[in-house]
């Protein structure tokens, strides 16, 4: 029987949560992230889109290095059914980095990894913290004036409403 390996990003998150301890705002945030953390698998763009559609994505989004939040946001504007996802991914199969990618139907794709870095996203581990529609992302970006940080911003809003 094949042993299923636990997602290393969730293990990493759990480890940091233990280091932080049980008290304080940071501990609360880590507990919430652990509740929301969802291991996912990303597929190649070619499993979801045609070559013509991939060329159109490159042309209209113009994805850039070190701008995954921008890339994922703009991609979600092109196709209304595409969701924006924030979470973490492994970097070269090692440590976790904060990252944004997209969900198309029931499949996850990462245009930054494929179209900018020319890397195979299926070789990395991913952990989603939140999936958002275009309206939510636009609202947050307009409010704060930059791309990204949707998950922590919404977390803080929910905490302040309580």
Regions found by a protein language model. Name each.
Residues 1-162:
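A structural boundary/capping signal
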């Amino acid at each position: 029987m094949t042993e299923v390996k636990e997602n290393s990003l969730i293990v990493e998150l759990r480890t940091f949560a233990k280091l932080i301890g049980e008290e304080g705002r940071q501990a609360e945030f880590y507990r919430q992230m652990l509740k929301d953390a969802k291991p996912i698998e990303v597929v190649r763009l070619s499993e979801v889109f045609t070559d013509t559609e991939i060329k159109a994505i490159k042309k209209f989004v113009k994805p850039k290095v070190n701008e995954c939040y921008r890339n994922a946001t703009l991609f979600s504007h092109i196709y209304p059914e595409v969701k924006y996802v924030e979470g973490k991914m492994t970097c070269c199969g090692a440590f976790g980095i904060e990252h944004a990618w997209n969900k198309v139907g029931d499949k996850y794709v990462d245009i930054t990894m494929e179209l900018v870095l020319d890397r195979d996203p299926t070789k990395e581990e991913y952990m989603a913290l939140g999936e958002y529609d275009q309206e939510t992302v636009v609202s947050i970006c307009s409010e704060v004036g930059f791309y990204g940080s949707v998950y922590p911003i919404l977390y803080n809003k929910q905490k302040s409403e309580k």
